Structures are given as C-alpha cells and as structure tokens.
C-alpha cells in the first residue's frame, strides 16, 4: 500500500493548537498515522458527506477527507464531540 500525504487545513490547525496538552500528543500521533492507514480500525464514514471520515480520540473527533486518486488525507476539523458536527 502506498503512503498518503497528510495535510492539515488552516482551520483545523488552529483547532489543533487549542487542544488541551493531554489530547494534543495523541491527536498528532493519530493524524500522522493516517498517512499509512487512512481508514484505521474504528474510523467511521460520515453520513451525508462524500469521502468524509472521522476518528475518535477520547471525547475529541478528527474529521478528514480522503482523496484516493491523489493519495491525500485532508484534516478539516478537530473538536470536542459536542461541537464537531455543528
């Protein structure tokens, strides 16, 4: 399997910077691993969205797009579960 490039969109980067320190290291580790496995165990495809997925990190969610043609994972949102789908 070939490796995917991972990009973090500007809005998601700002959300990442605002994460509590206890969550930040775990989030970065999970995001980096998406380059090797963009659909890890436990990820879910979001209903009503084309190619949009989410992974769970405790009470936090990382929402991302997968472009299999370009081999690209784009992180679009990182937020607490109560806020992420607004």
PLM region spans:
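Basic, Lys/Arg-enriched alpha-helical interface segments
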Residues: 1-57, 68-74, 83-86
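Residues forming the ATP-binding cleft of Hanks-type serine/threonine protein kinase domains
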Residues: 79
């Amino acid at each position: 399997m070939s490796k995917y490039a991972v990009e973090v969109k500007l809005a998601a980067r700002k959300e990442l910077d605002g994460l509590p320190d206890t969550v930040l290291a775990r989030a970065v580790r999970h995001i980096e691993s998406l380059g090797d496995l963009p659909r890890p165990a436990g990820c879910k495809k979001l209903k009503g969205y084309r190619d949009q997925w989410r992974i769970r990190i405790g009470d936090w969610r990382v929402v991302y797009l997968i472009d299999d043609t370009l081999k690209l994972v784009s992180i679009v949102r990182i937020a607490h579960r109560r806020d992420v789908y607004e």
